[in-house]
């Protein structure tokens, strides 16, 4: 998992509340358990004018010109600005996978569904919670100023606007540690690899019949 320390990125505003995981990555694309290949189908039903199917050449599909991510001014965005209850609906790690592969490292919203919120941290995506009034103001500024960027400092737990105003956010210390050091569940386990091998060696000697 890529470490997350500091980043400055273009902001794309998704002005919709209660965006669910099936809207983030539709169910027909969930057959793969690999973490790659989902970016082209992020927000598929909004992003394209046709019905998406696995294995399609997305470069030949008709784009919806009204969808925010298809607008030239938001190309290359790495910060997604969203509304309340982002990531609701069914549990699927494919949702943060798709956001990450598209290029988003950060989501900013007033609130999230719990499962999506937890899955995001486990997959290198930082979901920041800001007060609704702060999010409202960000939407106004992003839409009024082309090329609007935010600077996020995870260690300091700050979001800095182009005008210099700093917004603080809370994050669980353990999740913060994992993101700063690029540690997913496998990475955390491998930190104790020597202790695990030592236990297995001792257990094999104590209970040899279990390994025959």
From Swiss-Prot:
CDD domains: IPMI_Swivel. This is 3-isopropylmalate dehydratase small subunit. Pathway: Amino-acid biosynthesis; L-leucine biosynthesis; L-leucine from 3-methyl-2-oxobutanoate: step 2/4. One of its GO terms (molecular function) is 3-isopropylmalate dehydratase activity. The gene is leuD. Keywords: Amino-acid biosynthesis, Branched-chain amino acid biosynthesis, Leucine biosynthesis, Lyase. One of its GO terms (biological process) is L-leucine biosynthetic process. The keyword Lyase applies. It catalyses: (2R,3S)-3-isopropylmalate = (2S)-2-isopropylmalate. It comes from Pseudomonas paraeruginosa (strain DSM 24068 / PA7). Gene3D superfamilies: Aconitase, domain 4.
């Amino acid at each position: 998992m890529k470490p997350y320390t500091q980043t400055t990125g273009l902001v794309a505003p998704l002005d919709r509340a209660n965006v669910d995981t099936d809207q983030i990555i539709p169910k027909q694309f969930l057959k793969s358990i690999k973490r790659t290949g989902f970016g082209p189908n992020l927000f598929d039903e909004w992003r394209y004018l046709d019905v998406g199917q696995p294995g399609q050449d997305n470069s030949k599909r008709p784009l919806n010109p009204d969808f925010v991510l298809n607008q030239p001014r938001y190309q290359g965005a790495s910060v997604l600005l969203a509304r309340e209850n982002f990531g609701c609906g069914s549990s699927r790690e494919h949702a943060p996978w798709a956001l990450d592969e598209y290029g988003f490292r950060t989501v900013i919203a007033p609130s999230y569904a719990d499962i999506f919120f937890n899955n995001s941290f486990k997959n290198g995506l930082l979901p920041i919670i800001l007060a609704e009034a702060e999010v409202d103001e960000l939407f106004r500024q992003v839409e009024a100023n082309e090329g609007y960027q935010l600077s996020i400092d995870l260690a300091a737990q700050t979001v800095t606007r182009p005008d210099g105003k700093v917004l603080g956010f809370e994050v669980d210390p353990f999740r913060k540690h994992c993101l700063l050091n690029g540690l997913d569940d496998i990475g955390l386990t491998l930190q104790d690899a020597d202790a695990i091998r030592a236990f297995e060696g001792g257990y094999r000697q104590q209970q040899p019949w279990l390994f025959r």
